[in-house]
Amino acid sequence: MEKTTDWNALWNDLVEIRSSDRRKRQESGEGKDPWINRAHRFQEGVRERWLQKDSSRDFILSRIDADSTALDIGSGTGAWSLLLSPHVRHVTAVDPSESMLSVLRENLAAENAANVYIVQGAWPDVEVEPHDFSLCSHAMYGYPDLAEFIRGMEKHTRRTCFMLLRATDLNCVQSEAARHLRGHPFDSPNFTIAYNILIQMGIYANVLMENTGYWKPRVSPSLQAALERLKRELCLAGIDEHDEFLLDLLRRRLSRQDGVYVWPSEVCSALVYWESRQ
């Protein structure tokens, strides 16, 4: 009989690989808050992506109403909280990073958004009241037990839960590398794993793929820079035994254009949503 994949355990394994790598960086001087020097840069990246309309934002706005409340889990610098705030009674923004929340406070003051309340802490260990809608946009990747994370969302949601996740092509550069290193195509937590976790929890969620297609392709100035980036993403910094394979992979898959190396466009966003069972 074929063995059934424990998708939550796979998610946990991938999170733990990244957590171990993060602990090493903290010991080498990164600090407990990895966003301390990157929060404003993160915000600029979000703003650049949001210059283009996408179906996820339009769809979520079509589902909420002026008398409802929204919970923004892993709010970061507040792009979603600020988007939702004019359309609901109030928003609660939850995030563990003081660096992110500091930028969020600046943004709330600049927009005079008085109906956004901030709770600092890691989900699902924070104390908040149930809301009509809950949203987590790409902020679940660091939590090892996604099933518990989802149960926390449902517990605090009266109507609809929304999750936005990275959906990677299972033949992308990172997937080919992961097959070689780990025997499966997953380099990190993503939509495919999360959706299978939902199914194993008995949740048959709806999915809306972003209609803008793949994210903007990444660019590396050299093959060596591309190798360093790929190794960083695979948590292989300081480990050289796979370099020959990875360099060959990058030579095959990246294209050289105008003096730089362009990665294939292989990632988009998936909006997953379902009615809370609470």
For the regions a language model picked out, list residue spans one by one.
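A short SAM/SAH-binding and catalytic strip from SAM-dependent methyltransferases
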Residues: 132-145
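Conserved class I S-adenosyl-L-methionine
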Residues: 1-64, 160-187
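A short glycine-rich, Lys/Arg-flanked "PGG" loop and its adjoining helix->strand segment in the class I
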Residues: 147-162
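Short conserved loop adjoining the S-adenosyl-L-methionine
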Residues: 125-129
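Conserved Class I S-adenosyl-L-methionine
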Residues: 206-278
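Class I SAM-dependent methyltransferase SAM/SAH-binding core
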Residues: 71, 77-124
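Short alpha-helix
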Residues: 187-202, 206
